[in-house]
C-alpha cells in the first residue's frame, strides 16, 4: 500500500541499477500461470540491459501489461501468443508486451494509461494509470500501438543506464549523467 501511495504522490524512491532481462523474468514468474492460457515468447538483446530504478515497481508495470494481454486473448477461439520483447536503441530501453487480442475502439485506445473505468469486469481502471505514474517516476513513459491485423503493443520506455561509477555514486546514460538518490 505504501508503494502505491508513493507512486500516486509521485515521490522518487531510492533507485538502483536494474537488469531489464531479469526484471522481465521475474514479471513472467509473478504474472500467474501464463503458459496455461497463452504461448509466451521472449525476445531479448544479447548484451546486459540496465536501467536506473526500483525493480519491484518496474516489474509491476510489466506484470500489468502481461495480465492485460492475457485478458485480451482469453476469449479467442484458438490458443494465442504473447511476445515480451526488450529493445535497446541508443539511450532508450523499450520493454513491450504484444498480444493478438481483438482490436480496441478509438475511445478505449485514447484512454490507455489514463485514470478511467476499466474495460475488464475484474479491473478497477487503475492499472495502466499507476503504470504510467511509475514510468514517469523513472523518467520514462508508456506507449501503445495497434497491431495489424489485430492486437496491441504496450511498451514501457525508459532511459538506458550505460555506466555506473560506484566510487562517486554517479549514474550515467547516453543523454548525460544524474546523481543517485542515496
Where are the language model's segments positioned?
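Short beta-strand/loop element within the Bergerat-fold HATPase_c
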Residues: 79-91
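Detector for a conserved hydrophobic position within an alpha-helical segment of the HATPase_c
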Residues: 135-136
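Short alpha-helical Gxxx[C/S/T] motif in the catalytic ATP-binding
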Residues: 127, 131
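Conserved micro-motifs of the catalytic ATP-binding
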Residues: 9-13, 50-53
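Conserved catalytic submotifs in the C-terminal HATPase_c
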Residues: 39-49
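A conserved beta-strand-to-alpha-helix junction within the catalytic ATP-binding
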Residues: 14-28
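Short conserved segment of the HATPase_c
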Residues: 104-116, 171-172
Amino acid at each position: 500500500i505504501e508503494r502505491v501511495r508513493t507512486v500516486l504522490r509521485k515521490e522518487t524512491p531510492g533507485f538502483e541499477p536494474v537488469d531489464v532481462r531479469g526484471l522481465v523474468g521475474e514479471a513472467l514468474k509473478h504474472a500467474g500461470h501464463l503458459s496455461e492460457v497463452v504461448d509466451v515468447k521472449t525476445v531479448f538483446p544479447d548484451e546486459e540491459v540496465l536501467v536506473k530504478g526500483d525493480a519491484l515497481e518496474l516489474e509491476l508495470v510489466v506484470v500489468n501489461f502481461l495480465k492485460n494481454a492475457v485478458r485480451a486473448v482469453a476469449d479467442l477461439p484458438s490458443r494465442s501468443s504473447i511476445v515480451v520483447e526488450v529493445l535497446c536503441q541508443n539511450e532508450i530501453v523499450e520493454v513491450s508486451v504484444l498480444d493478438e487480442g481483438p482490436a480496441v475502439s478509438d475511445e478505449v485506445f485514447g484512454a490507455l494509461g489514463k485514470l478511467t473505468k476499466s474495460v475488464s469486469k475484474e479491473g478497477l481502471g487503475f492499472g495502466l494509470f499507476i503504470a504510467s505514474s511509475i514510468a514517469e517516476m523513472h523518467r520514462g513513459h508508456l506507449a501503445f500501438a495497434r497491431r495489424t491485423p489485430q492486437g496491441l503493443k504496450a511498451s514501457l520506455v525508459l532511459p538506458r543506464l550505460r555506466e555506473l561509477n560506484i566510487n562517486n555514486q554517479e549514474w550515467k546514460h547516453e543523454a548525460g549523467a544524474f546523481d543517485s538518490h542515496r
